[in-house]
Amino acid sequence: MSRRLGAAAAVLLLWLAVLTFALHGYYGGRLGSARRRNILLQHPALALHLPTRKMLLAVASFDDASSPSSLTTTDRHHHHHRHHGHHHHRGHDRWNRKGVPPTAAGPGEEVDPRFGVQKRLVPTGPNPLHH
């Protein structure tokens, strides 16, 4: 009798795990989402293989790739790679591009030319938190 009870408990736990995955893992806990229903109607094969988040990403990327503006987005991202020989971006790594000299204010009153705010003193030396 106890062996039969153990088997019934195992089957019950297995069914609960399957139902939990089906309701929360697969659908993300939102069974009545209108967008999901529309996606499933347009692409029914996705419902059998992909979890909800991956399904939405796959459909969104498929829609983005098929849109006419996707080509201009790709061109914009790869614009810099066409001009490897040109060096018209030389000033990007300099912190003081405009050449503004530091002000002659006293210590602690100096204005940072990058951010336009007063510079703060940074403590130097050993870290007091390390023993």
UniProtKB/Swiss-Prot annotation:
Q: Does the keyword Oxidoreductase apply?
A: no
Which biological processes are named by the entry's GO terms? Answer: cell differentiation
Q: Which residues form the signal peptide?
A: none
Start-end of Basic residues biased regions? 76-97
Q: What InterPro entries does the record point to? A: CLE9-13
Tissue/organ expression:
Expressed in all aerial apical meristems, including the floral and inflorescence meristems in the reproductive phase and the shoot apical meristem in the vegetative phase. Also detected in the primordia of lateral organs such as the leaf and the floral organs.
Q: Which UniProt keywords apply?
A: Developmental protein, Differentiation
Q: Residues annotated as region Disordered?
A: 67-131
Q: Describe its function.
A: Non functional suppressor of the fon2 mutation. In Oryza sativa subsp. japonica, the protein has a single amino acid substitution at the putative processing site of the signal peptide while in all the other varieties/species of domesticated and wild rice tested the protein is functional.
Spell out the family assignment given in the record's similarity comment: Belongs to the CLV3/ESR signal peptide family.
- Which PANTHER family does this one have? CLAVATA3/ESR (CLE)-RELATED PROTEIN 10, INACTIVE PROTEIN FON2 SPARE1
The name this protein carries in UniProt is: Inactive protein FON2 SPARE1
> What is the organism of origin for this protein?
Oryza sativa subsp. japonica
